[in-house]
Amino acid sequence: MTASIYLAIPLMIVLGVVETAVLPHFPVFGTTPQLALLVALAWGLLYGIEEGAVWAFFAGMFTDIFSITPVGISSMAFVVGITAVLWTKQAFPTSRVLMPLALAALATVISFLVNIVLLLLFGIIDNLQSISLLPTAILINVLAILPIYWLLYIIDRIVRPRRVQI
C-alpha cells in the first residue's frame, strides 16, 4: 500500500460532511450520489483491490460518523461492495468508460443490499421500504462515476506520469 492513506482520510472527511450536510438539500430524483463510495471505487479502479478496500473502509467510516447510522455499517457495506466489484473486474477487458459505469452500478447494488441487511439485523430499520430508492441510487451513481473517475485519472497522470522507454 502506498502513502495514499494520507490523502484518503482528509478527503473522506470532507466527502462525509458533504454527503450528510450539503447533498441532502439538493436531492436528484429523491436521492443523492454516494460520493465517498464512488471516489473509493474510482481509486480502486486506478490502484487495485487493496487500495480500493482501504479507501472504502474510510469512506464508510466517515459516512457513518457524520450520519445517524451506527459506525461500521456503511464501512462494511462499502468494503464488501467495492472489493467484490474490483475482484470481478479482473475477468473483464479494460475499459475506461464502460467498466466504471458497470462497476458503479454493481457496487451500488451490493453495498446498498449489504447496508439494508445489516440495518435489519441490528434493528435500526424494520421494513424494506428503503429498497425502493435503489433504482434511482443506481442511476445517480452511474451518472456521477465518470466525472469522478476521469478527474482522478487525470490527476494521477499529472502527478505520476508514466515512464516511457524506447
Each language-model region and where it sits:
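Terminal, non-globular segments
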Residues: M1-I166
